[in-house]
Amino acid sequence: MKFAFTDEQRMLWDTSQAFLADTSSSRAVRMACASDRGFDDALWRRVCDDMYWQGILVPEENDGLGLGWVEMVIVLEAAGERLLTSPLFAVAQSAAALTQCPKTACRDALFGSILAGDIVALALSNPSSDWHCVDARVDTSEGVTHLSGEAGFVSCGYAAEHVLVAAHNADDTLSLWSINPSQEGVRIERTPTMDQTRPMAHLYMD
C-alpha cells in the first residue's frame, strides 16, 4: 500500500514547522520548563488562537476542524521535533476520548471548553507502570454518584480546568466522567518527570 500526504497535509506540516521555529526555540523551551506552570500560557494561547490545533480532532458539528489522526500526528510530530512545551498532547487525548462518547450536552460543553483554550486532561491509567489497568471506580447509591481511586501520568493534570476520568462501573464496564479538579474530594499533585517538556500529575479521588 502506498501512502502519501495530501497537499493540505503537507501545507499543515509546513505551517506547523514555521510557527514552531518562531516560537519554540531552545531558550523558550528551557524557560517554560523552569516556570511554575511548566509551560508558557501565552504561547498556548497563540497555539489556540492562531493555529487552532486544539480543534483538529473536535468534530465540525462542534465547531472544530473535524480532521483525523493523520493531521493530529503531523502537528504532534512537529511539536515533538521542536520540544514544544504545552498542553497540546493532553488536549488531543481528551478530544479523542470525547469523540468516542455519546452525543450529550456535557460532551458538547467539553468540546467548547477545548476550543476556548481550556486545558482538559485525561486520567486513564493507574499509578503503576501498567498502562492497561484503570484503578478508579464509580459507585451510585441513592441517586448520588461517587468516584474513588487514583490515576497516574495525567498529562498537564495539575493545570487542567477539567479532568476526564476513566472509571470502572459496578458491572466492571468502563465509563468516562468529567470532574472539576478543585472540587471537594479531589486532589491533583504535579509529579516530576525525566522529560520536563511533558509535565505530568497524579490524581487522587476519595
Predicted regions and their residues:
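Flexible, small-/acidic-enriched active-site or ligand-binding loops
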Residues: 133-135, 153-154, 180-206
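Amphipathic, small/basic residue-rich leader segments at the start of a protein or domain
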Residues: 1-88, 109
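Short glycine/proline-enriched turns and hinge-like loops at secondary-structure junctions
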Residues: 67, 131-133, 156-160
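A short core secondary-structure module
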Residues: 150-187
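N-terminal glycine-rich flavin-associated loop
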Residues: 85-105
